[in-house]
From Swiss-Prot:
Record has rRNA-binding as a keyword: no
GO cellular component annotations of the record: membrane
Disruption-associated phenotype: Loses the ability to produce yanuthone D, but accumulates 7-deacetoxyyanuthone A and 22-deacetylyanuthone A as well as two derivatives called yanuthone H and yanuthone I.
Domain of life (superkingdom): Eukaryota
Name this polypeptide is given: O-Mevalon transferase yanI
Length: 448
């Protein structure tokens, strides 16, 4: 009896096995992502074909992949988890393009002058210069100032002075955060004002108009969120580099910071929307896997001038590029389901991006039947433009909401008995609120 009472009075000692110590100090996916990036920057400085280089490369690949199985960062914000998951896959695709399938210091060159064009030879740089060179290589997304500048970067007229450039960038930051605040509070207002299920206080016309407003808010609001993910770093960095003339030489020029998005005026077809209007941040490394696979084809197939061969190459490249983009975004839903302990989900991003590629193929076929050529700017008639705007916007808004936003919101565990459109609206609100540093929200006494 006394032994039993003594046993209950003595607290249980914690298990301090080696495995428990490792688990208690295990790294999160964020740590592995940072380690993989730092190792990628260091690898080009190691001698080629050396044991050191192979060892660093193996360690870098291990860290990049370990990020997908390590515990997600300790947060319950689904928008933050989604963004970090997309970032991990984005960087992995970047490594595939600029590290795994090439020798970076031999393949990628900074442009030191344009008239005539002169390229920097990174193999001749000392280690003190090659490390910053590699940091720039793995940081840039559109290849501005490099020999691999992506196509479709919007043309813009740079301000006449650095002070005007800095002012314009500061105003853009203010407008961006104010827009995010507006998206957040508008979503809050709509979510609070709409009736609960089972009530009928609006006619069909009012319901349709309300739904169209929500579609527009979801699509345009998330477009601003996507923009903010780039601008959050690019805008302050451009102010620092141009305003104070610091950083890489190419970054100190105002022309090195063109807009991320092209003109909506050019988006009168799906091909032009994705090729001209939408951002080019992923264009290089989403197309890299297809280009790598095509490099194994016989020369006769890769260089054939036959129409069937050219069309096959063109559309296979486009389809694979959209699939890779879908996989990158799918990593966000995968990360959310792991971080929140939800059933494993991959969202609907792959289906959505494949649908865009197939739609472009159908659109191209229709234009071919109607003898319409949209490849050149300025040749489309007024009727062609406005019919194109309506068709493109209608398809894009519907497919974006139903095949991308709704599945991602459901995979994030968002629930609303009023239906999936309200779930998508809540996802939009969370995404806008999750963008860090929103001083506009704080200024208006709104918690972001």
């Amino acid at each position: 009896m006394n032994g039993s009472n003594l046993e209950h009075r003595i607290p249980a000692l914690p298990h301090l096995g080696f495995g428990d110590v490792l688990l208690s100090h295990s790294l999160a996916s964020t740590h592995y992502t940072v380690l993989a990036f730092l190792l990628a920057v260091c690898i080009p400085s190691a001698p080629r074909k050396s044991i050191l280089r192979y060892g660093l490369l193996l360690l870098q690949i291990t860290c990049a992949l370990q990020a997908f199985v390590a515990p997600p960062p300790p947060t319950s914000d689904s928008a933050v988890l989604y963004t970090s998951g997309v970032l991990m896959a984005n960087l992995l695709a970047r490594y595939f393009d600029r590290l795994y399938t090439t020798v970076p210091e031999e393949s990628f060159h900074r442009i030191t002058s344009t008239k005539p064009e002169s390229r920097e030879d990174a193999t001749k740089l000392p280690i003190t210069q090659r490390l910053p060179w590699a940091l720039e290589l793995f940081s840039v997304t559109r290849g501005i100032g490099w020999n691999w500048r992506v196509s479709g970067i919007p043309k813009s007229t740079a301000p006449k002075s650095r002070s005007r450039f800095v002012t314009a960038q500061l105003l853009t930051i203010i407008a961006m955060y104010a827009g995010l605040y507006l998206v957040e509070v508008t979503c809050q207002g709509l979510l609070a004002s709409y009736s609960s299920p089972g009530t009928t206080n609006a006619n069909a016309v009012q319901t349709l108009a309300g739904n169209l407003v929500m579609y527009a808010l979801i699509v345009l609001g998330l477009a601003l969120v996507v923009y903010s993910h780039f601008a959050l770093f690019v805008l302050p960095l451009s102010i620092l580099c141009v305003g104070l003339q610091v950083g890489p030489v190419a970054w100190r020029d105002m022309s090195a910071w063109p807009p991320d998005y092209g003109s909506l005026w050019e988006a009168y077809s799906l091909r032009r929307f994705w090729g001209i209007t939408w951002h080019q941040q992923l264009r290089r490394h989403t197309g890299a896997p297809a280009a790598y696979l095509f490099s194994f084809l016989p020369d006769a197939v890769r260089t054939s001038k036959r129409r069937s061969a050219r069309l096959t190459r063109r559309y296979m490249l486009m389809l694979i590029t959209f699939v890779i983009s879908g996989l990158i975004h799918t990593s966000g839903s995968y990360h959310v389901s792991r971080g929140l302990g939800l059933p494993l989900s991959y969202g609907g991003e792959v289906k959505y991006f494949i649908s865009q590629a197939i739609s472009i193929m159908i659109e191209d076929f229709g234009c071919w039947l109607l003898r319409i050529d949209d490849r050149s700017a300025g040749e489309a008639s007024t009727v062609r433009r406005w019919v194109g705007y309506i068709v493109t916007a209608g398809w894009y808004f519907w497919s974006r909401v139903h095949w991308s936003v709704m599945p991602v919101a459901l995979a994030s565990g968002i629930q609303d008995e009023r239906g999936p459109l309200f779930i998508a609206l809540e996802h939009t609100r969370r995404s806008a609120a999750a963008v860090p540093g929103n001083f506009a929200a704080k200024a208006w006494k709104i918690t972001p």
